Amino acid sequence: MKRLDFVFFDAGGGHRSAANALKAVIEEQGRPWEIRLVNLQEILDPLDIFRKYTGIRMQDIYNVMLQKGWTLGSAQMTVLMHGLLRLYHGGQVRLLKEFWKQGERDLVVSLVPNFNRALRDSLPATPLVTILTDLADYPPHFWIERQNQYLICGTGRAVEQALALGHPSEHIFGTSGMILRPTFYQPVTADRAAERRRLGLDPELPTGLVLFGGQGSSVMPEIARRVTARAQFIFICGRNKKLADRLRGMDTRFPKYVEEFTSEIPYYMHLSDFFIGKPGPGSISEAIAMHLPVMVERNAWTLPQERYNTEWILEKKLGVVLKSFREIDAGLRELLDASNFVRFRANAVAITNRAVFEIPDKLELLMQR
């Protein structure tokens, strides 16, 4: 039996989600593999200077920043973080080597950025493959390092970046997109009109799904306050009950439904006509998989590793990119213009993303080499 480690952390929800989705598909396929999910944060906790001085893990600080929208200057913060990672590289390698002593693995699968050099140096004799959970790399030293390893890339842009850094083509595997949970490939049969009525919505109004990750975002009430366009909205607030209560208590010009944490995102997307959120690779890919045109913003507060995603949306003609959600009404007029909407939706329908089902075959191939 082959033994694989899937390495993730919880700085943002996409890394754990991708690891779990891939593991679920592999188990469903009945492959004779033993998969261990490895939380990198737990291994490196002794080196976490934020935890040492504040009692709060670095990944938790990052998640609070996302929730509060404190992302201005994040590009400069990334440079600072990379400096700290270089400073503590030796300690990271030491802790990882101790962890690997628990048993040899046939393949280490990294679903995290920033730490791939430490992963490579800590286990040099074992094949390492990094699966990019972003549409593209944010060089230098983010996803793609100059080292002997394999890479799985969900876009042509990421493949080009890997080749430009000198990785041989036989070490690079392209897929048709980002890893999505298997539930996004299962049909949703609920009657849209009936379900909208059940939620207190108008069955005929254009319906937007507003989603900003597992903790919501402070921009969601601003969106609710500013909208005057002929539309209605489903707000998903995640584990942020305070935000959900605030939205429920708002007087809005449109019908709305507010949900807290839910695993039924495909259901709510089935009830929706378009998506509004941050340009995260997971949310965008989920919306496109459900054939929803998207609306996002790009400005100085946008995370640097997510800025390319807005270019991808415009390049593929999948929706509207705003400078700020203060322009939400103008953005909705553009998105919901009849000819624009038909084109955006047709382009979304034309994209077929089967990455989560493609990757197991690529991992099998790597272990046969």
Regions found by a protein language model. Name each.
Residues 353-369:
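C-terminal alpha-helical cap of glycosyltransferases
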Residues 275-277, 293-303:
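Short hydrophobic beta-strand element within catalytic cores of glycosyltransferases
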Residues 255, 270-283:
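Acidic donor-binding loop of glycosyltransferase active sites
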Residues 340-354:
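A short, well-ordered alpha-helix in the C-terminal region of glycosyltransferases
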Residues 193-197, 201-271:
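Donor-nucleotide binding loops and adjacent catalytic segments primarily
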Residues 68-166:
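Active-site and donor-binding regions of nucleotide-sugar-utilizing enzymes
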Residues 149-207, 212:
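A nucleotide-sugar donor-handling region in carbohydrate enzymes
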Residues 21-99:
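Conserved N-terminal ligand/cofactor-binding loop architecture of enzyme catalytic domains
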